[in-house]
């Protein structure tokens, strides 16, 4: 699901208005896209899209963002953070971050957004649904949303 050309991160970035959205890694993992918004505007769009008020940020929320990168779920490790910076992203969004990544971002005034692991994968069912429909002509798909364990 993560290594799919229309993965969860690609869909999320498109939904907040990013243009020229492509995968972050060559294997189809993550996403990157162009925006022209303040960090705070992106935060509000993501908050509304994911129905999650528990978004945490690092960096100046008045900063103008031109390029955003995202990996849903637990993408806050060294490899993913380095890749976001390597492609020139001004903002990196994920569901979880390692503590030392947060500290590095704070020290360098790099913009990070932590949206929560569950919230970042809200569109999983839709992506899986689309993949299955591409491969099976006759299939009935039943979707089930269990809810965020942190918020009830």
Where are the regions that the model predicts?
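Active-site catalytic microenvironments in core metabolic enzymes, especially phosphate/sugar-handling
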Residues: 1-152
């Amino acid at each position: 699901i993560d290594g799919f050309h229309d993965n969860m991160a690609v869909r999320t970035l498109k939904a907040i208005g990013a243009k020229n959205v492509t995968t972050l890694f060559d294997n189809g993992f993550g996403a990157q896209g162009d925006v022209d918004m303040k960090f705070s505007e992106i935060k509000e769009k993501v908050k509304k899209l994911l129905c999650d008020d528990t978004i945490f940020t690092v960096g100046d929320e008045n900063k103008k963002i031109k390029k955003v990168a995202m990996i849903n779920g637990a993408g806050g490790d060294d490899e993913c953070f380095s890749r976001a910076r390597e492609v020139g992203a001004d903002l990196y969004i994920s569901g979880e971050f390692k503590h030392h990544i947060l500290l590095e971002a704070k020290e360098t005034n790099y913009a990070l957004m932590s949206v929560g692991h569950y919230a970042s994968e809200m569109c999983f069912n839709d992506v899986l649904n689309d993949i299955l429909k591409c491969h099976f002509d006759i299939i009935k798909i039943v979707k089930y949303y269990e809810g965020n364990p942190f918020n009830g």
